[in-house]
Amino acid sequence: MFFKKVACFTDIHFGLKGNSRVHNDDCEAFVIWFIEQAKLHGCETCIFLGDWHHHRSATNVSTMNYTVSNMERLGKAFEKVYVIMGNHDLYYRDKREINSMEYIRNIPNIHIVNEWLVEDDVAIIPWVVQDEWKKIEKMKQKYVFGHFELPYFKMN
């Protein structure tokens, strides 16, 4: 089984407002609250659905320090943490070869999802590039997690 109970969050955008310390402190407070809530509800797995950072080309060292400490916090709290690459995490909008999260790869329990991950009835999909979106409608998985902007697809 891929997971028993999962907690998800998305689009935290560390580094917003010019890498503002106030904003990054608010993000950190949210991560702490999120972990508390997830643990209260018995979640052993976390999926972050993309856009950890706000600026694909201007994330500063202070923001990177917030990233490391909060990813370590998530890694300690959950058995598995899947970190999906969103469009703001990628250097190029139309390809996934360079991202702002690669340096957290060695934090225990953290799994960076920069390519499609499909296992049993679960699919975890990073920012969709080129015409990959066409594959989604044919998927049979019960659970599909991703950072999506799909043409012609209404989401709610």
Where are the language model's segments positioned?
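His/acidic metal-ligating clusters that form di-metal
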Residues: 41-42, 120-156
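Short, small-residue-rich loop/turn micro-motifs
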Residues: 10-13, 148
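Short, intrinsically disordered N-terminal pre-domain segments
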Residues: 1-2, 7
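Short boundary motifs at domain starts and secondary-structure transition points
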Residues: 1, 117-118
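Core catalytic region of metal-dependent phosphoesterases/phosphodiesterases
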Residues: 5, 12, 16-116
